[in-house]
Amino acid sequence: MDMLRNRPVKGSLDHDPQLSADGTNTPAASDGSDQRSDVIEKTAQLSEPIADSIRRFFEIRKLDGPDGTGVVFENISVEGSGTGAQAAPTISSAARSAFGVLSPLQHRLAGQFSRPILSGFSGTIDAGEMLLVIGKPGSGCTTFLKTLSYMWDEYKDVHGDLTIGGHPIQESMVKRPQDIVFCAESDDHFPTLTVAETLRFAIRARCGPEASATEVDMMVAQLAKLVGLSQVMNTKVGDAYIRGVSGGERRRVSLAEALATCARLICLDNPTHGLDSSTALEFIETMREWTSQSRCVTAMSVYQASDAIMPYFDKVLVINSGRQVFYGRIGDAKAYFERLGFECLPTTTLSDFLNSMSADPEVRRVQDGKQHLVPRTSEEFEAVFHASTFYQDLQRSLETAKVEARTNPRPLVKARAFSLPLHHQIWYCAYRQFRIVTSDYSLWAVEPATIIVQSLVLGTLFRDQKRATQSLFIFASALFYSVLVPALQSMAEFGNGFAQRPLILKQKRYRICRPIAYALGLVTTDVVWKIAAICYNIPLYFLTGFQRTAGNFFTWFCIVYLEHLALSMFFRSVAIFSPNMHRAVLPVGIFFNMYVLYTGLYIPAPQMQVWLGWLRYLNPLYYAFESVMVNEFRDLSYQCSPSDLVPSGLGYTDMANQVCAVLGSRSGEESLSGMSYLEAQYGFGRSHLWRNVGINAAFFVFFALCSGIGMERLKTPAGRLATVFYKGRPSIRNSQADSESGAVHDDVPPDVSRQLSGDQHHLNANSERDKNHTLAWTGLCLDIETKDGTRRLLDNLNGWVKSGQLKALMGVSGAGKTTLLNTLAGRSSIGTLTGTLALNGQLLPKFFRSRMGYVQQQDIHLPTQSVREALQMTARLRRDESIPLEEKNAYVEKVIEWLDMEDIAEALVGVPGAGLNLEQRKRVSIGVEMASKPEILFLDEPTSGLDGQSAFSIVRLLRRLADSGQAIVCTIHQPAAELVEQFDELYLLSRGGKLVYDGPLGTHCDKAIEYFEQHSRACGQGENPAEYFLDAIGAGSRKEVQADWVGLWQQSQQSKDRERAEKALVPAEGQAPLAPARRSLYAVPFHVQLWVVVQRTWLYYWREPDYAMSKLWMSVGNALLNSLTYLQSPNTQRGAYNRVFSAFMSLIVGPPLGLQVQPRFVTLRDIFVHREREGFTYHWLAFVFAGIIVELPYTFLTSLVYWLLWYFPVGYFRTAPRAGYSFLMYELFAVFATSLAQMCASLMPNIEAAFAANGFFFMFCNTFAGTLSPKPVTPSGWRWYYKVSPLFYLGEGVTVDVLQDLPLRCAESEVSIFQPPNGTTCGQYAANFLQQATGFLLNTDSLSDCQYCRYRDGQSYYQQYGYDFANRYPNIGIFIGFIAFNFTMVLVMTYLTKIRR
């Protein structure tokens, strides 16, 4: 550790504490006078431009000479919810819980368990000091930082005292909450904004309205310079799906946001995650200077901290399983633990040594003869620390701080929690949202295009309707669609805000903007954007032939606009008050169907049942529909169409003896008043027009406020922070071990498996390897086309890796490490690749990818698979068919044993926080690839995000695999010296994908060091070789390259020797590629692939009961809504209308069904595309067919529930042929809805676009179902579409089935009355008419007031829709054909959008 002496700090790292009489450690005398000088010495080592940049930033920010305040915490204890290990939920367990069949009390009490996370933490952090928090994942580091940041609402209970500047944290958070900031490990940003826009928003929000635009821009420039982002300011931030800056640069954006707050207490959770060692060191240097100049307090956890980083910290806190085992000067920590009997090897970094005190006992090195004297458990460590003089000094410092706070109290001046007033926040949020909308192609181009298409189709379908009674229903349908399309758009948008929740909460913590400001900013943007959205519907208005006056048009526009706003706010509020998207789908689906049903068209107000009619008063869609109908009909009269005249035909010419058989008409009148029709048919009133506009405006305001309030009350869900789910019940051993650990991590559950210890398992190389393999590459170049021309990512690279070799692939940020790894593994799909790839001297064929293992940086797994199931699936699908299944499973058990995963073999992978921890997930990722028994194993950043001990555990595992004969290539970012020495060879890249070294590392990296020392400075004693290599070639944003390392390597003797050796490893020109061992690209036949993937998909559905229960309850809710609305419909004229629309309403559940189906399909697709596809695990058809096959049983079951609750209560035929036909058609419809949803999901790039597309296609299908737009009155240009409209065949079949042979009668209000000529009976006068009429006379012998009932039976009623009973059975086959077409398109669209390259 001599290298560390070059950086003196308070409490020098080589300081040796004295041993007190009681056997505890006593620190050497220190008067504390060197505190300021130590800080000066540290900052003096920084480059002057950085110090100047910070100083300049503070000057612009007007923070000269801030009043520094310290932090004091005493006896802090934290409890969180969680049960450690428990059985995974399934559909059966959810059913038992829902219906209370078995132990209902158990489920109610399941969430009441609490576990200690932190116990009795105490300490002080003075102003200008930096605290390093060390502990393995799961020990409580994140919890401690969140507790300092007063994020207490995430936990069940927090005890103890925490003060800032002598004031209780509660008081500080009330008066100055902006002084505390917590930067999480995740990077949450708006991906379509640029880096400059992201930082400008944060700085503008924290500086307040006083800062000018010039000052804000200057601060943005200075901050970008500090964190090394100056070159990417105009690049999108991006995310996993949107291309933007690199992962390391995105991390620096997050850190820059945290610094922009200029808080007095800055807590950073693993801030160097994703940064290479040089960039990480630069950031810590920046934080040292920032902390010293601002006199703030900085606390951070850092995993895999190098020795170069450690001196910049003043104090260190070591946590073991939620207990404080050391707190003091960082220079005293090493000696303290050495005095306890532990040993720190020369090659072990101080960070890793301290971190081992948090790990399991097996990974700690103990001095000879002290094995039984050292503490082992966290309780023992805590007891030893409490008995030491370090703890006594800590207690004295606490008392001193208390006395100082009492004697010299510092006034706590209350300041605004947010620098910007609320109205300014709303304005900036609205502007930001406008930028997001305009930068997202799908929002400003795709969505308007779909709306315009909808409007044009509907407008031409209802084009130029005449002012006649025959067009009354057509006008009503067109007006209904004008309010329905915005409703569909609003429903499709409900899920857009879930992804932004972590970002909104982060900006609330940073006091950048209030969540309510974000919500109202969205509202402000909507107010503008929805105007444009409604404008796209204008073709519908004018093409249909609505009243073309300015007053009527703008009234219509205002009505639809306010309805769109109100519904958008409503569905957004539902989403905000729902914990996640899956839970939100249920209320959204039920409310959407209720709104559509109670619009007033499907069931007019006079026909509504008394027990549900009140629902219309809660329905913005009802108010909008009534208003647009009144707006259109109020001043018009409609000529009675010949088909509506009773009687009509030859000999019936005197209107005095005729009547218009339409509700609202009067005997002897040739025209019908529009308002009379509305009042009689729908119960609408003229005076309701502007009243309804006002009500919808009130709905908009109310729901907007609800969304704002709901957003303001958003909290990070505490959840069950430490739950690992097992198949069945977890073993007692696992539960006990987990309970004893007592530690919980916010993001990662505690380690329930044992750590890798030494060489616990021996890997037999010869027994498990078929042969030795050598992968060689020569002249590799990769070029891509950009807007600025051709860009080379890889530049003439040569190299090889052999069986038994562990090769480290390193380089500066952006050097192309992952690109090279993808290229070697055959996974690169971009640009033009040239050069040669060979295995054992033969060219690589395409099939060889299935025999290579590739462990991605992201651990992508299906959450519901157990560890053993995940490995067994890979073994079954990627190992040759000729190998017996028993042998494959036996090999999986060996892999599980090698990776020390026996204890978690039956655990579900889960998600972070409710599943395996980060290291366990990484082991599973490695195990999945090892189960395929690959010839070459590639790993991309396997230690990223891990603590030092976990990283070493993973690398040591790789070392053992290499010793067993496995060839391994591994990229690595921040390797400690101990990690680097585990590798055999180093492959080092510089910027531009150029090679600067390829060769052996040697013992303690001496061979590689010797090469670099020939052309650069000498490697310091104890210096990390990896950092030395990267520093030499100019890694980091502030380094300048001092030599042409690419040229030096090409001219070196080592390079020439490697080139000569490579010639024997590459094929001669014209040599044939390696002969495939099998004909197929896949190891097993397709039917085996399909069976295995279906099994996995079935378990995915079975073990996530939320989906099945949501699907079931949506069916129950919508069926009851439909059946209770049309309960026992009578055999009247309106009863026939109700029977038709009840059947039609059963088809409206399609879009909500899509909301449930599509996320499942997308999840399965993404797992295949991002992990399983590249390894030829199984054919893409297998996952598509599996998604279809497994979905169908759930579809059949829930549609059966819907049909039973709907069909019989409405009063349809109960004969087996009729009921059976209806049941069959509804089951087919449910399958059709599933197929359409999956087709849209396969077509669209993301789930939001899939939601919108599903609504779009369903609107088309429903439009041409023949009910709202009857075929006989459809313009001839559109009649052809009924032949290709699937729901027309369904609607025809169901309608004729429920109406055929149904005798109809007339209620009193439905009778049309006309007067016969004097002296003529009604029967005599209407005899000729009745021969061709669809209705009948009620009083044929009367001489006056002839009563005519328009329809005599069901078939006479459905003829108006162009339906025919003879088509009933042929429609079944046709509809099945449409279903087959949809599923075929699922295959085609999946291939075109995700498979074809």
UniProtKB/Swiss-Prot annotation:
ATP binds at residues 811-818. One of its GO terms (biological process) is patulin biosynthetic process. Keywords: ATP-binding, Cell membrane, Glycoprotein, Membrane, Nucleotide-binding, Repeat, Transmembrane, Transmembrane helix, Transport, Vacuole. InterPro entries: AAA+_ATPase, ABC2_TM, ABC_transporter-like_ATP-bd, ABC_transporter-like_CS, ABCG_dom, ABCG_PDR_1, ABCG_PDR_2, P-loop_NTPase. SMART domains: AAA (SM00382). Its main location: membrane. This is ABC transporter patM. It comes from Aspergillus clavatus (strain ATCC 1007 / CBS 513.65 / DSM 816 / NCTC 3887 / NRRL 1 / QM 1276 / 107).
